[in-house]
UniProtKB/Swiss-Prot annotation:
Task of the protein: Minor structural protein that acts as an endoribonuclease during lytic infection. Degrades host mRNAs in the cytoplasm by cutting them at preferred sites, including some in regions of translation initiation.
Residue ranges, compositional bias (Acidic residues): 327-344
EC number, UniProt record: 3.1.27.-
GO terms under biological process: symbiont-mediated degradation of host mRNA; symbiont-mediated suppression of host gene expression
Cellular-component GO terms for this entry: virion component
Gene3D superfamilies: 5'-nuclease
Record's protein name: Virion host shutoff protein
Family: Belongs to the herpesviridae VHS protein family.
InterPro entries in alphabetical order: PIN-like_dom_sf
Major localization listed first in the record, in broad terms: virion
Keyword Nuclease attributed: yes
Alphabetically ordered keywords of this record: Decay of host mRNAs by virus, Endonuclease, Eukaryotic host gene expression shutoff by virus, Host gene expression shutoff by virus, Host mRNA suppression by virus, Host-virus interaction, Hydrolase, Nuclease, RNA-binding, Virion
Biased composition (Basic and acidic residues): 309-326
Organism: Equine herpesvirus 1 (strain Ab4p)
Amino acid sequence: MGLFGLLKYAYSNRLVKHDAITTPPGIMTPIAIDLWNVMYTLMEKFDQERNFPLDGAAVTARCFFSLLRLLLKRSYYPIFVSDRGIYGDGRVKQGAKAIVSQTMSSYGGSGRLSSACFTGDEHDTEFQEDPEENDVSVPPQDTCPPTEISAGYVEPERKCEHSSTRWSALDGAPRLSYRLCVNLIRHLGYPYVNACNLEADDVCANLYHTNTVAQIYTTDTDLILMGCDIILDIMPLFPPTLRCCDVLMDLGVTYDEFLTEFVRCHTDLHEPQTLASVQSVISSLHSPPDEDEGADMPQTPSGHSWRCPNERRVISWRRQDDHDYDSSTEDSDQSDSSEEEEECPAGKGFGYRENPAVETCKRRTRPRRSAEASGRILHLKYTSRYPPIMESAPRALVRMAPPKTRHEVLERKFVKHVVSMLTPERRGSLSIMRRLPITQEPSNFSLVHDTLKNLVSEHEIARELANMFWNHIPTPTDYNTVLVNYWDDCGHRRQWS
């Protein structure tokens, strides 16, 4: 789920940091919660520890109570997000799974492949992409009001899995009660986003890049590909956190390079035979070119041809300056960077910075992180941001060669989708990025009690759960107050480090 092999790479290179909570008492950190991803993880842990049978609704209520208690202890303020809206009955029109479904559902139409691509050789089939490709530059804002839901609470679409032995498919595993979860969120008074036509990943990315939430609680690593910072687990006292800027600086690449090259590792876009691991992409990008220049260009493990047809793609470990591609470095041993950049042939219509292969081996032994990259981290009141992510995102599409195979079409459409999410609208001299609307209903504990009484089969367990929520879960603060306390800051306190 996410980027195949990214967590292994992050842990092996010590990119997962265990940070302490830095906010003072009374100041809560707003985070987005990928609801179903987190709930499935908690229910799996709870099911492994319990030694007595419980129905699915009771297990769901206990896990949700544990989640809220942990969030309170860590001073986290949750904003809940789910696929296809909070009720799970919407129809996703954007995102990785929607792109795969729309592209593969028909042989013709906007941006789809001809029937020849579905027979014979998979890797080198030519096609023409329709110029009238669906434009997703403006994310839709439609939401489903509660009054439009009658029976409601459709089971949300789950992540594509490569194994049939997942925990929820095992015999005797308790089923997640979606209706119970949604009703508890609403009646306890917690905020949520009800975007019916978006995946949870896209909603979380929108909340993150509009400076609504500081981080995202999920185990789905494709949010790193969208430039976000994620919390992997809130149970430890110092929650493990993976930041996109740490991955970029460790690899020594810009965000547009990271997006265009590592999109091959996205598990929702690729089937197992075309899916590449993060380690294989790193090895292929930093390997020296073939000695025989006249030989055909080699394929990557996922079947991708090299982006530049005449020479192999090489990214050095040295960090490139994000805002000035033609600037030279300050170090005397890197004076060769002022030479003219190599580009692909003019007929291809795209180019990017290349480094000679002889320099690549030398640069590998140098530290991957650089002072220039670290100096661009923007420290805010209680958190930090990395502006080069949004600055370099529009260059991603320029870097990509015209697609020739169906999985390259999926990659290009997904990159276009991510770029559209990260690119602000220009209105005169202003750059505007619209945040998805957040809903917060008034707290009503009578409805919480009714929900537990109606959905939990054992009345004694329902009464016990109601007492737990009543005694230990306070009424949440208005989310606008939390956002103002966390993000609002005087100009003299915002600094570059």
